[in-house]
């Protein structure tokens, strides 16, 4: 089951009334970066449309559900390799790494390419691996320092492997840069983590516990409504980028026949102010929304923080396995460019 890290941009897709002429930059800023202060009278109409579309989506569910027998070992697959062997895989990855500058979609990118040893691909697939750029110290042909576009790195990559071949052997990891360069000289440090275990909390909607600890995080369930699982992480920063980076949660819905529902599984952050309004009024109109959240309140939404959301196509109505992945093996690699 794949989780798309922080699809807050989905808010835009929820709205049926936003046409292609609208400037997407404000949507990216408000919903993908948590920059509510950029809302103003000129763009507020599109923002209200997006919020209203999101609320409509929360009230709609897919009636056709595909089921599959729940196999815990299959879902929570673990590596058969020892931690020492996994460390040697990272060492091999470091040794085989190559960095290059490429231009794609009119944007210059720093590209890391490498591969794991053959014994790794027999025991794991690359979804087990998270890669994050930690530091970048390089200059271009004019001796000007090259700067990574940190927003792109955090929001789009965030440890996600963007490309892998059919043998799950070669990896490719990309970061945008905002300094025009024909060549680069220097070093890049990446952190590489490998999945080793899962922290699992079994929940029952008919007798729901609302607070629990998982993977060193304190979770408070705000609500499980229809197809969305809304929760707060109490012992972490409420700042958007940090919450986005730490989003490491999934949920499985298991019926009384021990079957799990299949479908899309999205994860993202939502402004607390928005969800609290929806929780009180499922059928809120646009006019009511505008009265409760005038532009000046929209602008201040990020001050009150964000909830975490897991969204499925179908309603949560059975036993729920809420889980977090544990990356027990971690090591930095330094690559020359």
Model features per residue range: what roles?
Residues 1-25:
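Bacterial Sec-dependent N-terminal signal peptides
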Residues 22-337:
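Alpha-helical, hydrophobic structural elements that either
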């Amino acid at each position: 089951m794949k989780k798309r890290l922080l699809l807050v941009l989905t808010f835009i897709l929820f709205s049926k009334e936003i046409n292609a002429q609208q400037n997407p930059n404000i949507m990216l800023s408000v919903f993908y970066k948590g920059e509510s202060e950029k809302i103003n009278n000129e763009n507020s109409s599109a923002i209200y449309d997006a919020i209203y579309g999101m609320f409509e989506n929360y009230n709609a569910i897919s009636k056709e559900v595909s089921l599959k027998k729940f196999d815990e070992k299959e879902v929570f697959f673990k590596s058969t390799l020892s931690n020492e062997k996994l460390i040697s895989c990272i060492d091999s990855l470091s040794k085989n790494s190559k960095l290059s500058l490429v231009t794609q979609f009119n944007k210059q990118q720093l590209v890391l390419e490498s591969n794991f040893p053959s014994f790794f691909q027999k025991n794991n697939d690359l979804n087990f691996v998270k890669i994050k750029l930690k530091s970048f110290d390089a200059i271009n042909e004019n001796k000007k320092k090259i700067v990574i576009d940190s927003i792109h790195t955090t929001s789009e990559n965030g440890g996600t492997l963007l490309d892998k071949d059919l043998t799950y052997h070669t990896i490719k990891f990309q970061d945008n840069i905002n300094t025009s360069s024909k060549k680069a000289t220097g070093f890049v440090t990446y952190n590489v983590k490998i999945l080793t275990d899962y922290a699992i909390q079994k929940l029952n909607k008919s007798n729901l516990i609302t607070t629990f600890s998982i993977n060193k995080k304190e979770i408070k369930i705000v609500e499980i409504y229809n197809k969305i699982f809304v929760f707060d992480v109490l012992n972490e920063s409420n700042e958007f980028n940090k919450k986005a980076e730490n989003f490491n949660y999934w949920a499985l819905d298991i019926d009384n026949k021990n079957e799990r529902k299949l479908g899309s599984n999205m994860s993202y952050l939502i402004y607390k102010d928005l969800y609290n309004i929806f929780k009180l009024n499922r059928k809120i109109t646009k006019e009511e929304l505008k009265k409760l959240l005038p532009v000046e309140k929209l602008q201040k939404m990020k001050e009150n923080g964000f909830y975490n959301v897991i969204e499925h196509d179908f309603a949560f109505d059975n036993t729920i396995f809420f889980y977090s992945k544990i990356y027990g093996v971690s090591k930095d690699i330094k690559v020359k460019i």
